[in-house]
């Protein structure tokens, strides 16, 4: 199959974060095939990630959207545990990107958070694949944020 990387996203999301991630990965990982798998909701992301990784991909970015209700938050918890299990059991990179609908009131602000978070985490995935596990060491403790301005380090 050659080198590949995965993007898993949902139809529940209100922003097409998958396309944002795809664009970054195409630019940062030339020569890699991008496998995209869109599923209905966040509880479906662990299965999608596992299927993508089973195809031989080196890593996957999952892009979920959590609604405002308690049931949505519990669904996210289940999905998060599932994604952790996929990462541990496969030994491959799984970057879990999630936007919680209660992070902002204005739809425009939510969209900006989603795009920024998807872009920055896709950059992280590309760096980890290109440079290996030490790729992000230079950023440790720097207070970097995805979806918001960086907080900066505490001196």
Swiss-Prot record:
UniProt cross-references to InterPro entries, sorted A to Z: LS/RS, LS/RS_sf, Ribfl_synth_arc
CDD domains: Riboflavin_synthase_archaeal (cd09210)
Domain of life, source organism: Archaea
Keyword Transferase: yes
Catalyzed reaction equations: 2 6,7-dimethyl-8-(1-D-ribityl)lumazine + H(+) = 5-amino-6-(D-ribitylamino)uracil + riboflavin
Protein keywords: Riboflavin biosynthesis, Transferase
Gene Ontology biological process terms from the UniProt entry: riboflavin biosynthetic process
Pathway note: Cofactor biosynthesis; riboflavin biosynthesis; riboflavin from 2-hydroxy-3-oxobutyl phosphate and 5-amino-6-(D-ribitylamino)uracil: step 2/2
Pfam families in UniProt: DMRL_synthase
Transferase recorded as keyword: yes
Gene3D superfamilies: Lumazine/riboflavin synthase
Gene Ontology MF terms in the entry: riboflavin synthase activity
Enzyme Commission identifier(s): 2.5.1.9
GO cellular component labels: riboflavin synthase complex
Enzyme kind, highest EC tier: transferase
Family under the similarity heading: Belongs to the DMRL synthase family.
Name of protein: Riboflavin synthase
């Amino acid at each position: 199959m050659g080198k590949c990387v995965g993007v898993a996203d949902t139809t529940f999301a209100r922003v097409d974060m998958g396309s944002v991630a795809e664009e970054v990965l195409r630019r940062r990982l030339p020569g890699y095939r991008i496998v995209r798998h869109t599923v209905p909701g966040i509880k479906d992301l662990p299965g999608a990630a596992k299927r993508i990784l089973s195809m031989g991909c080196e890593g996957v970015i999952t892009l979920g959207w959590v609604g405002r209700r308690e049931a949505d938050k519990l669904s996210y918890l289940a999905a998060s545990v599932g994604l952790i299990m996929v990462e541990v059991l496969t030994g491959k990179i799984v970057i879990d990107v999630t936007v919680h609908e209660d992070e902002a009131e204005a739809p425009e602000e939510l969209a900006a958070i989603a795009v920024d978070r998807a872009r920055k985490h896709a950059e992280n995935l590309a760096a980890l694949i290109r440079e290996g596990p030490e790729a992000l060491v230079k950023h440790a403790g720097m207070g970097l944020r995805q979806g918001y301005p960086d907080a900066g380090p505490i001196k």
